[in-house]
Amino acid sequence: MDEQDILNELREYRNQDLKYEEGYILGSMCTKPHPMARKISEMFFETNLGDPGLFKGTSKLEKEVVSMIGGILHNKNAFGYLISGGTEANLTAMRAFKNISKSKGKPQNIIIPETAHFSFDKAKDMMDLNVVRPPLTKYFTMDVKFIKDYIEDSKNEVSGIVGIAGCTELGSIDNICELSKIAVENDILLHVDAAFGGFVIPFLDDKYKLDGYNYDFDFSLNGVSSITIDPHKMGLAPISAGGILFRDNMFKKYLDVDAPYLTEKQQATIIGTRSGVGVASTWGIMKLLGIDGYETLVNESMEKTMYLVKKAREYGFETAIDPVMNIVALNDENKHDTCMKLRDENWYVSVCRCVDALRIVVMPHLEIEHIDGFLESLSNTKKY
């Protein structure tokens, strides 16, 4: 095949994909990247952060990006990496937890909520972790009292806690402030999965915050050891650009393995070969948008979220919980059936595990007309 024939055939495959701007993707936490990312991607497409000595400029960019993201999370001196996504970030945190607890002679008992991302199921399987699942409150957050009592009764057998800041299904935020206190009092590691919420919560206008809800989640809390945060979600970076940040570089020695044939003799990330595109794109987009740009982005998405909730209620649909961020769960006892009917109309939503509900993520690519069209189709599925 010649080059043009190859490109034409590839274009036919690409045309089978959904496009974010069409508005039919309502269940994804990713969105159309910022347009500048295309130019940056071309500039950095051959870089490999797995061998940083060969790509010194890109490696410097990664350190700068980690510091920039750390600044959002109240710790410019954080240590970490931009990696493939939230799954690798959570696996990395759990690997550090396991190795630290082993060094202290403690069992690998980790408290992880039912609302946690399925990447923690992978961590449990790969690392043979012992997972404790606390009950949930009516707000779909971990029961802090249960955790306190469990740790007290277990006589120092718990080595780590995972809290969620923007759970995948509902957007709920665990009481990280209280979990932080527990972690400090009991010398326990605390990882926060803010893969989605990390680029939402810091920019959320107070008018969208729920009364009595604690939105604190980052390194300003002394007990927080590590945070997952993904620029390729609400950060507008291209896939793949996930982030794992640790409070300081003390954690590095629990991640390093020898890599004698590379320009640096140790490597800490799970994936060895890492493109620099995610790093460079994140750097550029964060520099371009700044705090003001992200505040506008998040609060426009929240405005559309409130519109969706209001219109859904006019159609007779109710939410499982009031939206904590730009994620909406609409109650539906026949969620799987409804999901498939909507797919027949080309609407791609997802379903919640922890409650009978459809899950809609109001990402920046969604417009009001898309929301109106979706709700009309959803209403029509209930007429038959």
UniProtKB/Swiss-Prot annotation:
Q: What are the N6-(pyridoxal phosphate)lysine sites (modified residues) in this protein?
A: 233
Q: Which Pfam families match?
A: Pyridoxal_deC
A GO BP entry is: coenzyme A biosynthetic process
Q: This protein's superkingdom?
A: Archaea
The protein's matches in InterPro entries, at most eight in alphabetical order, are given as: GrpII_AminoAcid_Decarb, MfnA, PyrdxlP-dep_de-COase, PyrdxlP-dep_Trfase, PyrdxlP-dep_Trfase_major, PyrdxlP-dep_Trfase_small, Pyridoxal-P_BS
Q: Reaction catalysed?
A: L-tyrosine + H(+) = tyramine + CO2; L-aspartate + H(+) = beta-alanine + CO2
Q: Name one GO molecular function term.
A: tyrosine decarboxylase activity
Q: Which SUPFAM superfamilies match?
A: PLP-dependent transferases
Enzyme Commission number, as recorded: 4.1.1.11, 4.1.1.25
PROSITE patterns from the xrefs?
Answer: DDC_GAD_HDC_YDC (PS00392)
UniProt family annotation: Belongs to the group II decarboxylase family. MfnA subfamily.
Q: What does this protein do?
A: Catalyzes the decarboxylation of L-tyrosine to produce tyramine for methanofuran biosynthesis. Can also catalyze the decarboxylation of L-aspartate to produce beta-alanine for coenzyme A (CoA) biosynthesis.
What is the protein name stated in its UniProt record? Probable L-tyrosine/L-aspartate decarboxylase
Q: Taxonomic classification, please? A: Archaea, Methanobacteriati, Methanobacteriota, Methanomada group, Methanococci
What is the gene called? mfnA
